[in-house]
Design a protein with these regions (language model features):
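Pocket-lining segment of extracytoplasmic ligand-binding domains
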Residues: 1-58
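An extracytoplasmic/periplasmic, membrane-proximal ligand-sensing/linker region
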Residues: 57-115
Length: 115
């Protein structure tokens, strides 16, 4: 598991995916940014509320058990970005920069949205 290997290497949490917005878009169109945020949050909420139905709709086509998918979509995947995860992401960028995989370390700046 990639996350377990990352934890062994760095002692930090791993971020697998993010929703990102261009900072010009975020500053020039805050209402649209809020709308996108609200829709994404709603989709996550709906997905978690209907997790059983979602699993049942795909289980016949997957090589996993119901319990495995339930665990994966439940406590295994974290749906929030805490300071611990941001710290892990910064470490990822720092290591990628040291290995010349990226030219510069990106700034992580969270957009202002109503939660």
């Amino acid at each position: 598991d990639l996350g377990a290997e990352w934890k062994k290497l760095t002692g930090k949490k791993m971020v697998y995916a993010l929703w990102v917005a261009n900072k010009n878009f975020a500053s020039e169109q805050p209402e649209m940014l809020q709308l996108v945020y609200d829709r994404i949050r709603h989709a996550f909420t709906q997905g978690l509320q209907h997790k059983k139905a979602a699993i049942e709709s795909v289980i016949k086509d997957k090589p996993f058990t119901y319990a495995q998918l339930d665990e994966y979509l439940g406590p295994t995947i974290r749906w929030n970005l805490t300071d611990d995860y941001i710290d892990g992401l910064k470490t990822f960028y720092e290591l990628a920069h040291k290995m010349n995989l990226i030219e510069h370390i990106p700034e992580i700046k969270l957009a202002a949205v109503k939660r």
